[in-house]
């Protein structure tokens, strides 16, 4: 939304803002849930029960189609193949993708126009940007089919959670990063409605101990079945309920876009009396992974893309070994991304989920490159292991770890009323046990922890280059 439209929107009363949001959503829904949406949903419903080998065979066929299309219509890939003496016939399936180099963010920025297919009308392409959580935002383009398949994958996640998306589906409260309420607004309502999808949209930028009671009055009046949002925002809502001694039963909670830590999951499930279903997706639309009702990990949406795990030399790693997450989109033929190197690390599993689906299982993605601490002695510390000192401290409203130097971290604390000197000493002691005596640990009391412009929250922020 440009500045003029934003100012005009901000000047409108809340009911008119809701009407505009609903109308805009209805326009987007034609593409998201129109076209081949039902076809993709039926395909995903059928294929999820195939064996792993059969699913890979289906992917092999899609890879051949993608490679042929890319060679014939995308200048970047035509040159890449020719320079390497390759023909499309040399890539017979997923296993042959290793004959091609990984595609980096820098490659996309330098060759943006050359990566666009001449076979897809430019007016039909949609633009998107990564959030910039691991660097500067990256612009990518995708065709309508990629948009539709993304929402078919999301629809399957909702179905696995026992819920239904859409105007005639379950009522959903959404707590994400869109600035739907003017930031200068000091009084409720800090929410808007989207009737086209049966949603109540919450502002993530106005939540405070002073305002949360008003939020929950609105949520209660809306009577939702589902809560969908960023883990950090869901956790704020859940902690408020816990501190008030209240339970707010829902059918399911859907989380995505940030790492969901175990302490967040347990608090959210306790407060909302239901299971959390977490999914992983990227703006580049190369990977989509969802959680079923067994909660044994994330199922890769193998209809959506091919996923590889590589070591630091770009060599494939076996199942069970953690490495760089690399994805090839099987949905986006407008700007094909083949072997795109994400900034994420994870591992694939060799065994199936007990649910019986053949979709390959992926471990949680918890270690984005900038969020790993690198210490002076060369150790790298995953943020997940740093959550434990905070678990018993219900006196902390919010926290954030910032690494300024190899031997110094700052722990930002938004304290509750009962936060004490003993709690501070506990944190320093427990963190020092995990980081070592050579690391200086400073506790900084703050009113709020900063978020990214997208509204997302990074719990661990490292300003030190990754040491691996």
Question: What spans do the regions from the language model cover?
Answer:
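Nucleotide 5′-phosphate-binding alpha/beta core
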Residues: 1-129, 136-169, 221-228, 242, ...
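Residue-level signal for inorganic ion chemistry
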Residues: 70, 130, 172, 227, ...
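Conserved adenylate-forming
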Residues: 65, 177-303
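Generic structural signal for residues in well-ordered beta-strands
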Residues: 199, 276, 307, 399, ...
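Conserved AMP-binding/adenylate-forming
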Residues: 260-352, 369-371
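Carboxylate/His-rich catalytic cores and anion/metal-binding grooves
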Residues: 161-185
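AMP-binding/adenylate-forming catalytic core of the ANL superfamily
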Residues: 227, 331-437
């Amino acid at each position: 939304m440009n500045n003029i439209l934003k100012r005009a929107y901000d000047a409108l009363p809340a009911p008119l803002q809701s009407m505009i949001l609903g109308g805009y959503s209805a326009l987007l829904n034609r593409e998201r849930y129109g076209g081949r949406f039902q076809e993709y949903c039926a395909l995903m419903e059928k294929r999820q029960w195939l064996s792993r080998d059969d699913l890979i065979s289906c992917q092999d066929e899609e890879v051949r189609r993608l490679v042929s299309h890319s060679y014939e219509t995308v200048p970047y890939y035509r040159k890449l193949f020719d320079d390497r003496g390759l023909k499309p016939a040399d890539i017979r399936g997923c296993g042959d993708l290793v004959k091609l180099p990984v595609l980096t963010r820098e490659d996309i920025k330098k060759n943006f126009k050359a990566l666009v297919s001449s076979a897809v009308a430019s007016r039909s392409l949609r633009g998107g940007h990564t959030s910039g959580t691991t660097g500067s935002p990256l612009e990518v383009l995708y065709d309508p089919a990629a948009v539709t398949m993304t929402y078919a994958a999301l629809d399957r996640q909702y179905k696995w959670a026992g819920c239904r998306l859409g105007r005639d589906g379950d009522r959903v409260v959404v707590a994400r990063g869109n600035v739907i309420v003017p930031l200068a607004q000091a009084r409720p309502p800090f929410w808007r409605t989207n009737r086209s999808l049966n949603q109540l949209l919450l502002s993530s930028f106005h939540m405070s101990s002073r305002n949360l009671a008003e939020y929950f009055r609105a949520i209660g009046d809306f009577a939702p079945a589902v809560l969908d949002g960023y883990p950090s925002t869901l956790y704020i809502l859940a902690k408020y309920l816990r501190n008030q001694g209240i339970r707010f039963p829902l059918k399911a909670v859907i989380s995505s876009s940030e790492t969901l830590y175990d302490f967040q999951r347990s608090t959210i499930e306790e407060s909302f009396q239901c299971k959390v279903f977490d999914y992983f997706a990227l703006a580049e639309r190369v990977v989509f992974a969802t959680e079923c009702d067994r909660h044994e990990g994330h199922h890769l949406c193998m209809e959506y893309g091919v996923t590889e795990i590589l070591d630091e030399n770009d060599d494939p790693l076996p199942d069970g070994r953690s490495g760089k997450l690399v994805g090839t989109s099987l949905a986006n033929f407008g700007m094909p991304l083949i072997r795109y190197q994400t900034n994420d690390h994870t591992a694939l599993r060799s065994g199936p989920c007990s649910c019986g689906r053949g979709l390959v299982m992926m471990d949680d993605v918890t270690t984005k490159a900038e969020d790993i601490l690198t210490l002076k002695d060369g150790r790298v510390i995953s943020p997940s292991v740093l959550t434990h000192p905070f678990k018993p401290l219900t006196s902390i409203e919010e926290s954030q770890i910032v690494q300024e130097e190899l031997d110094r971290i700052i722990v930002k604390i938004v304290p509750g009323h009962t936060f004490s000197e003993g709690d501070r000493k506990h944190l320093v002691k427990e963190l020092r046990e995990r980081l070592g005596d050579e690391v200086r640990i400073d506790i900084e009391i703050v009113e709020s922890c900063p978020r990214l412009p997208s509204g997302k929250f990074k719990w661990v922020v490292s300003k030190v280059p990754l040491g691996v």
